[in-house]
Amino acid sequence: MLFQGILYALLFLLCAVVLAKVRSPGVRQTALLAASYALYVTWGPWFAIVLLASTGMNFLVGEYLRRKPSPAILFVGIVLNLALLFSFKYLPEIAALLPLSPLHRFSHLALPLGISFWTFQAMSYLFDLYRGDDLNPSFVEFALYMVFFPVTISGPICRMPDMLPQFRSQEPTAWNDIGRGLTRIATGVFMVQLAKLLGQGILGGDGISRGFDRVTHWSGPDVWCLALGYGLQLFLDFAGYSHIAIGAAKALGFTVPENFARPFQSTNPSVFWTRWHMSLSFWIRDYVFLPLAMLRRELWWRNLALVIAMVLFGLWHKASLLFLLWGCYHGVLLVLHRQLQQAQRKFDWEPGAMWTPLSWIVTLALINLGWIFFRANSLPQARRMLSAVLAPASYPSHILSGSLYLLVTTLAAGYGIVLLIAEALDRYAVEPQGAEARSGPGFLGQLARWRWFWIPPLYALALIFLLIVTLTRGPSTAQFMYNKF
């Protein structure tokens, strides 16, 4: 949501007070719903009208599905959702390519913020009802599910079976939840600011954005630096946003899905996609890949279903050839990894001690190489960059162009910071038991054993600090890279 501004801070505090003092689920839900729509309307009443129309349509279809789980009703609901998503997200891009067509007047149609996320939430609700889940939300509960302000704009993508019991809870927000939530918010703000510095350039050096937008000739090392740097920048930005969103929800007493779990420590592509943008990855797995894979038992079909799922993953971001190729690239990587696993089992091959570090290096390289499709400004640019990577002559003796010396020196430090953040969050903010459950040895373990680290007065100080940062230097919606998707 919009994390900068007096309105967000005031509504957040108002909701926090209501959830802490009021036990009536109806009052709590109404307060959250009013605050969520008040914030969403700030981007334009038209966006709120579209969201409200989608909410009403999906609630009505859901009522029919709850009474009679019919494939025809499910089909109608999914088609209506996809038609809405297509009209606002993909039709303007198609219309822009057809200047002489009557469709061209739709080329400037504004994209409602978060439409990709709340549309997928609505479809998961319909799928779950069709599968027989016992879900009976009221209209207010369903509307809150669609517009819950911490996660409306860029996720994580929630599911009704997880959220409905929390919406109906009468328990006041626990102090431990407030502490963990503020920890996540502070971490997220820090990560987003790092992403901004990395993208714009640090200490006057060329940043990732300049590298992609201004350089027309790349050496192989230049491309590797840009790819690794962009992967780090995107992670810091999107994971930072996710920490802010998850932290805001947690500080209000709600648990929403995690979105990242140390993805850069993955040792194969399959593990990576269980750790990166997890809420979308699991959505694609549960509602696209598994239903497709179960249609036939042949290996070739399961591999094809995997590629189709990843292509849809790519096109979910944007309807362009680059994102289609990005999805195909990762689909092929996943298929190749499956084939390698089968070969290992067939020949009863036991990997040696060096297998884990080597597989980590290869996985990191392949994943980051794919970001070229994700970030390149055009297909010819992506082709030139990949050609530089694959051409030995593009690796000059000076290793790096001078403008990227400073960038490459920050990458190792950046990845190190990411590992430290993951370790700290793992101990203090993610686990339900908080710091005391993960004390362990070392400096962080000692902090976990110091009880004063978690006393309520520090929560108050942290809240005051976060309000000041949010209102002055905090990230605005326009800063988040993933908002354009």
Q: Can you annotate each of these PLM segments?
A:
Residues 1-484:
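Membrane-embedded transmembrane alpha-helical bundles that form the catalytic cores
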